[in-house]
Amino acid sequence: MNTDNKILYTYENLEKDSEGYLKKTKDWNIKLAEEIAKRENITLSSDHWKVIIFVRKFYFKFNITPSMRMLIKSIQKEIGKSKMNSIYLFKLFPKGPAKQASKIAGIPKPVKCL
């Protein structure tokens, strides 16, 4: 029982689409990201967080979730080509960097993702 009168939000009781993406970006927080990542079998490292924060900033700046191509080009400009290439991003997010990072970041699925 919650005795401090705070509403506890967990992934289960938040509104999501059929694939598990949050419907309301304002519901996202760091703890929720960790919970979603755990469900995706990902242990978040500092590089995961760089990508997650990057896609959130991108979404709120341009009002669109970056596609894979857009993600790679944009993140390489900001973080550097040597590290954030497609091979490395797939190691971080094996089910697809744009798709999986967006889900963990609490933003909509990229339009071009199947």
Swiss-Prot record:
Keywords: Cytoplasm, Transferase, tRNA processing. Pfam families: DsrC. It is an enzyme of class 2 (transferase). Its main location: cytoplasm. It is found in: Cytoplasm. GO terms for biological process: tRNA wobble position uridine thiolation. SUPFAM superfamilies: DsrC, the gamma subunit of dissimilatory sulfite reductase. The keyword Cytoplasm applies. Part of a sulfur-relay system required for 2-thiolation of 5-methylaminomethyl-2-thiouridine (mnm(5)s(2)U) at tRNA wobble positions. Could accept sulfur from TusD. NCBIfam families: dsrC_tusE_dsvC. Interacts with the TusBCD complex. Interacts with MnmA. Belongs to the DsrC/TusE family. This is Sulfurtransferase TusE. It comes from Buchnera aphidicola subsp. Acyrthosiphon pisum (strain APS) (Acyrthosiphon pisum symbiotic bacterium).
